[in-house]
Curated annotation (Swiss-Prot):
Part of the high-affinity ATP-driven potassium transport (or Kdp) system, which catalyzes the hydrolysis of ATP coupled with the electrogenic transport of potassium into the cytoplasm. This subunit acts as a catalytic chaperone that increases the ATP-binding affinity of the ATP-hydrolyzing subunit KdpB by the formation of a transient KdpB/KdpC/ATP ternary complex. The keyword Transferase does not apply. This is Potassium-transporting ATPase KdpC subunit. One of its GO terms (molecular function) is P-type potassium transmembrane transporter activity. It comes from the Bacteria.
């Protein structure tokens, strides 16, 4: 007796087409439209601009080598967005311990502080290698260097750190107080009569 599909094949094709276009296309367009309308800044990457020029994203760390700027956490990915990753080295790894010791000495010399005063976040890399934030303590240890490089009183730089500190916990539950390094450096430039874009400081994002 021959098999009969009784419309099963047709129904399966209709379901497949509906799933493909309904969920694969229509849902994506609707979700994109809603997020673009309600969260336009976040939907486009939380980009930060100076005079309509994109200088970075609030979500992605970038390197700052100029002494006039605050430095972010170290990055195993060299701040490369396409290679985001941590070092994946265990705490017992001799290479990790040697790198931490070297970084501790470098940061202490750079910021004029005792080696034991260097916060752990300035010694270790985040899981993504692109963490855009520091704790207030991670920013505060850099105030002396930044103030000296700019010829400003330390209190002026400290006030900007305080002003750009994001309160926590978020929604009353999540996170700790933090400072977005790019936002802080842009605030420094704004307070310093538009120094952004010079040297190796805040630059246009590519």
């Amino acid at each position: 007796m021959p098999l009969r599909d009784d419309g099963v094949l047709r129904g399966s094709l209709v379901l497949a087409v509906f799933t493909l276009f309904g969920l694969g296309l229509a849902y994506s367009l609707i979700a994109t439209g809603i997020t673009g309308a309600l969260f336009s800044e976040q939907a486009t990457g939380s980009l930060m601009r100076v005079d309509a020029r994109v200088v970075g994203s609030a979500l992605v760390a970038q390197p700052f080598t100029d002494a006039r700027y605050f430095q972010p956490r170290p990055s195993a990915a060299k701040y490369d967005l396409t290679a985001a990753a941590g070092s994946n080295q265990a705490r017992s790894n001799p290479d990790l311990l040697a790198r931490i010791a070297t970084t501790r000495a470098q940061v202490a010399a750079r910021d004029g502080i005792a080696p034991e005063a260097v916060p752990g976040e300035l010694l270790t890399q985040s899981g993504s290698g692109l963490d855009p934030h520091l704790s207030p303590a991670g920013a505060q240890v850099q105030i002396r260097r930044v103030a000296a490089a700019r010829g400003w009183p330390e209190q002026r730089v400290a006030a900007l750190v305080q002003a750009t500190t994001e309160a926590a916990p978020q929604f009353g539950l999540l996170g700790q107080p933090r400072v977005n390094v790019l936002a802080l450096n842009l605030a420094l430039d704004q307070a310093g009569n538009g120094e952004s874009g010079r040297g190796n400081g805040v630059k246009q994002a590519h």
